Amino acid sequence: MSVQAPSVPDLRQQVHDAARRARSAARGLATLSTDTKDRALRTAADHVLMNTRAILEANEADLDTARSSGTPEAMLDRLALTPARVEGIADGLRQVAGLPDPVGEVLRGRTLPNGLQLRQQRVPLGVVGIVYEGRPNVTVDAFGLTLKSGNAVLLRGSSSAARSNAALVDALRAALATELLDVDAVQLLPSADRASVTHLIQARGLVDVVIPRGGAGLIDAVVRDAQVPTIETGVGNCHVYVHSSADLDTAESIVLNAKTRRPSVCNAAESLLIDAAVADVAVPRLTDALQAAGVTVHIDPTEDELRAEFLSMDIALAIVDGVDGAISHINEYGTGHTEAIVTTDLAAAQRFTERVDAAAVMVNASTAFTDGEQFGFGAEIGISTQKLHARGPMGLPELTSTKWIVWGDGHTRPA
């Protein structure tokens, strides 16, 4: 009989140990004062800026690896950090520090006829797992929002951003140590082995919720295999519908902004719907404008293209029969993210907003506005495309649950 030499803890054990440390940290975070959390967030912003050089060097190493492996330009843009983007990341932490603290907020309360006093108040979720692709800014956004809402966070980023994420987390943990807080409030899980995702999403009893951020493949895999609660985020086949009453100058401006501002993000428009009543005029005009901006317009889209989240300078074009045709098309092909109508007809706008099934519905505005910062939430943990427990851009309140507090005076319940 052979005897194996002792080995380091396996990956499952590493992930579970990290979750236990996060649980311990979360218990302390749950009762921190708002002032303490805000001070820690401002210190974290300072530490990110102090470490800009190390962060950018780590990011450049990630970019070099990504380029050598043929990563598409849109994905390189998501991965890239610049001095301005690092400054923006730090500013995001300061913005979160300035937001109202949701923890302890009383949602409702009453005194029962028997004298019992009830109140329902917000409490942290506990341990939040984030699984995300090559976007280093998510590392800090997730930390800021989870800390302010009293949660600990386990981060499992993409291996493509491993060096960037490590440099950022080092800065965040140093800030927590400076403020004498538990550094395990934020932990970065190994990204080289995909099994770490499995161990995280199946850590029932150790992790309270997992939020996947990324493409459809990642999100579907997490939701399918998870044994802990999940919140689906981000897959965005967003449509812009140009109604028969639309001002075409307005429509052109909105369509171009929704498609070309940042084509690699989930709130970018992927489909353009044009009302049949104005197709003869609107199709050539909007197609020419999009093509002049470098967009490939799929004029006779396949079924797959109608369902695609391109995340690139591509857009599917379809002709629909009136507002009901647009609603039917969107409810068939949309992903429940963001849908927009361009119209001067109030009745059409109201019908569209009432009947389209999406987390956000825009009237005469670009889909690009579906964003936590644009909505005034500061950074966002993601944009939920499901209906429970949160929907749309997820800010601080969406990272809480509730607890009932009942005060009595020796009350007992009669038989």
Curated annotation (Swiss-Prot):
<keyword id="KW-0560">Oxidoreductase</keyword>
<keyword id="KW-0521">NADP</keyword>
<keyword id="KW-0963">Cytoplasm</keyword>
<dbReference type="GO" id="GO:0005737">
    <property type="term" value="C:cytoplasm"/>
</dbReference>
<dbReference type="GO" id="GO:0004350">
    <property type="term" value="F:glutamate-5-semialdehyde dehydrogenase activity"/>
</dbReference>
<dbReference type="Pfam" id="PF00171">
    <property type="entry name" value="Aldedh"/>
</dbReference>
<dbReference type="InterPro" id="IPR016161">
    <property type="entry name" value="Ald_DH/histidinol_DH"/>
</dbReference>
<dbReference type="InterPro" id="IPR016163">
    <property type="entry name" value="Ald_DH_C"/>
</dbReference>
<dbReference type="InterPro" id="IPR015590">
    <property type="entry name" value="Aldehyde_DH_dom"/>
</dbReference>
<protein>
    <recommendedName>
        <fullName>Gamma-glutamyl phosphate reductase</fullName>
        <ecNumber>1.2.1.41</ecNumber>
    </recommendedName>
</protein>
<comment type="pathway">
    <text>Amino-acid biosynthesis; L-proline biosynthesis; L-glutamate 5-semialdehyde from L-glutamate: step 2/2.</text>
</comment>
<dbReference type="GO" id="GO:0050661">
    <property type="term" value="F:NADP binding"/>
</dbReference>
<dbReference type="InterPro" id="IPR000965">
    <property type="entry name" value="GPR_dom"/>
</dbReference>
<dbReference type="InterPro" id="IPR012134">
    <property type="entry name" value="Glu-5-SA_DH"/>
</dbReference>
<comment type="similarity">
    <text>Belongs to the gamma-glutamyl phosphate reductase family.</text>
</comment>
<keyword id="KW-0028">Amino-acid biosynthesis</keyword>
<comment type="function">
    <text>Catalyzes the NADPH-dependent reduction of L-glutamate 5-phosphate into L-glutamate 5-semialdehyde and phosphate. The product spontaneously undergoes cyclization to form 1-pyrroline-5-carboxylate.</text>
</comment>
<dbReference type="InterPro" id="IPR016162">
    <property type="entry name" value="Ald_DH_N"/>
</dbReference>
<dbReference type="GO" id="GO:0055129">
    <property type="term" value="P:L-proline biosynthetic process"/>
</dbReference>
<dbReference type="InterPro" id="IPR020593">
    <property type="entry name" value="G-glutamylP_reductase_CS"/>
</dbReference>
<keyword id="KW-0641">Proline biosynthesis</keyword>
